[in-house]
């Protein structure tokens, strides 16, 4: 069973083909709009939608030409329907529905976060058994779930204000650095020369619940920098180091509590921030010390991509899900 996946929720245009029977990704194409939006310091929704319109058909032609496949080989077309930028989602959904109608292929709406949650399965060495705890951590979401079976997601905790990745994005904007923020913070943190210069708070780390809060951490960074007399590149690096350490300390602590609370021994990490090297290192240590199993997506599939949508769509399709009509129903916000 072969699925074409389409991702267009924000600023990445992704198409991929996944073979469910072989558990194998056949092809994957991605066009990133980062350079386009970088000069604006963030994603411009109208520009994002226009870029998806310009690139989707080109990527589709390329992916079929390179694989030698045709639409006759495709059993289902999966597309991101929620959450995301409504205009961008509409472009991808309309493209998917149109292809489905023309070629008489079933279509299926996929939740963007479900795609991220399942993305570690794109590593052919991953054999993840249920149940497990999952941390979704990105610029838009920071959430902990217990996953008992495919499609059974129990929310354990989430950020009550900003996502972890948003704290990184806002910090880079404050410091006059580039976009996206997570990469810039990590790169500059590696250049820190005085790792104890700044001590930042760990909001809600010691609270018994599994919720997060990163707004206060973001504000602490802002106040610290405004009070700093020497706003040099060296101190930018030191502050990024302190921010990264504080955020990851909280994330790791909450993951440990979630595993203890649910009595699980398997942890899945996904979302854009899952590419962070320090986060991976600290969670690997946690897993080693407490004999947990931990699963990350391949680095190239941490951020938005079509491969995770094709994979999630395949799992949904074999579980009996598919669109019942041509209605396009996309949502800017939607819980998993």
Swiss-Prot record:
It holds the Pfam family TsaD. The keyword Transferase applies. Substrate binds at residues 136-140, 169, 182, 276. Binds 1 Fe(2+) ion per subunit. It is found in: Cytoplasm. SUPFAM superfamilies: Actin-like ATPase domain. Required for the formation of a threonylcarbamoyl group on adenosine at position 37 (t(6)A37) in tRNAs that read codons beginning with adenine. Is involved in the transfer of the threonylcarbamoyl moiety of threonylcarbamoyl-AMP (TC-AMP) to the N6 group of A37, together with TsaE and TsaB. TsaD likely plays a direct catalytic role in this reaction. InterPro entries: ATPase_NBD (IPR043129), Gcp-like_dom (IPR000905), KAE1/TsaD (IPR017861), TsaD (IPR022450). Coiled coil: none annotated. Belongs to the KAE1 / TsaD family. The lineage of its organism: Bacteria, Pseudomonadati, Pseudomonadota, Gammaproteobacteria, Thiotrichales. This is tRNA N6-adenosine threonylcarbamoyltransferase. Keywords: Acyltransferase, Cytoplasm, Iron, Metal-binding, Transferase, tRNA processing. It is an enzyme of class 2 (transferase). The keyword Ribosomal protein does not apply. One of its GO terms (biological process) is tRNA threonylcarbamoyladenosine modification.
